[in-house]
Swiss-Prot record:
Location in the cell: Plastid, Chloroplast thylakoid membrane
Encoding gene (name): psaB
Pfam families the UniProt entry points to: PsaA_PsaB
TM segment ranges: 46-69, 135-158, 175-199, 273-291, 330-353, 369-395, 417-439, 517-535, 575-596, 643-665, 707-727
Binding sites annotated in the UniProt record for [4Fe-4S] cluster: 559, 568
Record's keyword terms, sorted: 4Fe-4S, Chlorophyll, Chloroplast, Chromophore, Electron transport, Iron, Iron-sulfur, Magnesium, Membrane, Metal-binding, Oxidoreductase, Photosynthesis, Photosystem I, Plastid, Thylakoid, Transmembrane, Transmembrane helix, Transport
Subunit relationships: The PsaA/B heterodimer binds the P700 chlorophyll special pair and subsequent electron acceptors. PSI consists of a core antenna complex that captures photons, and an electron transfer chain that converts photonic excitation into a charge separation. The eukaryotic PSI reaction center is composed of at least 11 subunits.
Catalysed reactions, as listed in the record: reduced [plastocyanin] + hnu + oxidized [2Fe-2S]-[ferredoxin] = oxidized [plastocyanin] + reduced [2Fe-2S]-[ferredoxin]
Official protein name in the record: Photosystem I P700 chlorophyll a apoprotein A2
Gene Ontology molecular functions: 4 iron, 4 sulfur cluster binding; chlorophyll binding; electron transfer activity; magnesium ion binding; oxidoreductase activity
Bound cofactor: record note: P700 is a chlorophyll a/chlorophyll a' dimer, A0 is one or more chlorophyll a, A1 is one or both phylloquinones and FX is a shared 4Fe-4S iron-sulfur center.
InterPro entries: PSI_PsaA/B, PSI_PsaA/B_CS, PSI_PsaA/B_sf, PSI_PsaB
Binding site for chlorophyll a B1: 654
Amino acid sequence: MELRFPRFSQGLAQDPTTRRIWFGIATAHDFESHDDITEERLYQNIFASHFGQLAIIFLWTSGNLFHVAWQGNFESWIQDPLHVRPIAHAIWDPHFGQPAVEAFTRGGAAGPVNIAYSGVYQWWYTIGLRTNEDLYTGALFLLFLSTLSLIGGWLHLQPKWKPSLSWFKNAESRLNHHLSGLFGVSSLAWTGHLVHVAIPASRGEYVRWNNFLDVLPYPQGLGPLLTGQWNLYAQNPDSSNHLFGTTQGAGTAILTLLGGFHPQTQSLWLTDIAHHHLAIAFIFLIAGHMYRTNFGIGHSIKDLLEAHTPPGGRLGRGHKGLYDTINNSIHFQLGLALASLGVITSLVAQHMYSLPSYAFIAQDFTTQAALYTHHQYIAGFIMTGAFAHGAIFFIRDYNPEQNEDNVLARMLDHKEAIISHLSWASLFLGFHTLGLYVHNDVMLAFGTPEKQILIEPIFAQWIQSAHGKTTYGFDILLSSTSGPAFNAGRTLWLPGWLNAVNENSNSLFLTIGPGDFLVHHAIALGLHTTTLILVKGALDARGSKLMPDKKDFGYSFPCDGPGRGGTCDISAWDAFYLAVFWMLNTIGWVTFYWHWKHITLWQGNVSQFNESSTYLMGWLRDYLWLNSSQLINGYNPFGMNSLSVWAWMFLFGHLVWATGFMFLISWRGYWQELIETLAWAHERTPLANLIRWRDKPVALSIVQARLVGLAHFSVGYIFTYAAFLIASTSGKFG
């Protein structure tokens, strides 16, 4: 018999309909469901695929370096980072007429190019790269790593090199190696790079392999380290009039705690960053020696978990049984990893703009907006994925006997209380926030803006004041010059920090008012509702009062037939599906808020945000409509301009988004009838009927159509906003 796709499922391969293709694609990565899978092979397959993932990442980053070196303007950008537009790569399109060629030829290029809004120029400049040759070297090195990763992946699929199951289940060794090796050593190596290459480069000293051993990063070398006078490394830092990349105003310190920003670049002091990475390295190198392996010393994670019984016994058996539950469930481990990574990615979004670490990136407004939005969307997808795999864990891997009365079992026991509290919080936030917005809308519409309900966010302002913001006059903690907190840090980082917090030209602790109060609560509504849907999906994944045997139906099922009413749309997959819409809408509010507040800050008219953000019409008119006007003007009677591509993408994004509803708001029978009619017509049409298909065409399943609809909705939503964001920001600020 001929081998047909999918090879991993003979049952599916023999399906006579097009279901074979779609279900084959859908389950290609669900290794657990494949024929002849064993637990050991499952782990080996996933392990080998990690090498492929690394290869793709290295190839991609290599491509970035290569194209900028080949077609970019890195060397001329370095001469004037604030006015030269960084080029990502050249573009060639046979459709371009002369107006298009002229519109897209910028940044000092000879032909049409794309401008880089990713921040790579600022990053490479900060870490000490200075020439195209440096970029080519980096590209080749990453290409080498990519090849190495592919070889590693292939190697670990060979019988002699396949790790055993016991190797994968050795949690302590893995933790030690990842903490010390991955985080500790890499942070130490990065500190080394910053101290030996990046900091000298910021002071006009070009360190490469040929002079690496001759140039001391600090005049006294290792002397202060060996004699215990570590504070010497912080003496003589760069002065406030230091010109980045030159010797003018440069100091000699390598590890400092200055606080605040470099006045010229508006980014964190490189010597502060090096100090931070050294501290991280120190912590992780210690952490990576904590767990017991072959040597009989250190902690056993299992013992740690078993020992933690809650006091008084009222909270059950604590963490007993958790070690084996987590160690034997890939979905649990993936859920934990995704939850952590999702939070970290969102934190990256928040910190990249408020505490920028790359030189001059804070003044590249479009890049700031693009990076914030990019990281928040990625965080949203990763976090919803965490709950999806949490639900799969409960369906496939959870063993009630192993987890009797521990924290997992008690979560399931108390799920009604958890879900109803989340529901109450969501309802409260939703009705009150919408009520305030709508009230304010009506007041504006009737010409009585003074009757708006405007609430000052006094608690948030108090927190900002505690961190040193003096605008509000709270006179507390770091904003009080007489307090112990103020005096303790006065000789170290505090002056730099206070200067940064109270200088209104950066994004650190922006002044907030009633508009911020409302939008924060709108975002809180979105976060709580998304969480409600995800938590309910996971906690009800095994069963509910309505459907106690739900776990027997798997992760994604449409319904249990017509005989059991009400069993449609309640699979754990359906909860994930619904949560993604809420996640996207929530991040929409987050990014609208961030972008509008920053546009008014950058333009110097913060009063526009403050006055218009307290009612919905203000958001629709003064943010969305006002800022999309240039976008809609991408093509006009006078020809085209450099925003035309974004105008096209804006339209295309709407098209993709709207297409999603065709899959979301229709039923399977309609499509089945349509397909059969089209197949009938095809078979009776001359010439066309020469083309035959082996698989009988059938409509997508309900779950698949939902996935296709969700994918279109998500992609269209993000494309539309990306075009709006980049065009409206670059149209104003270049």
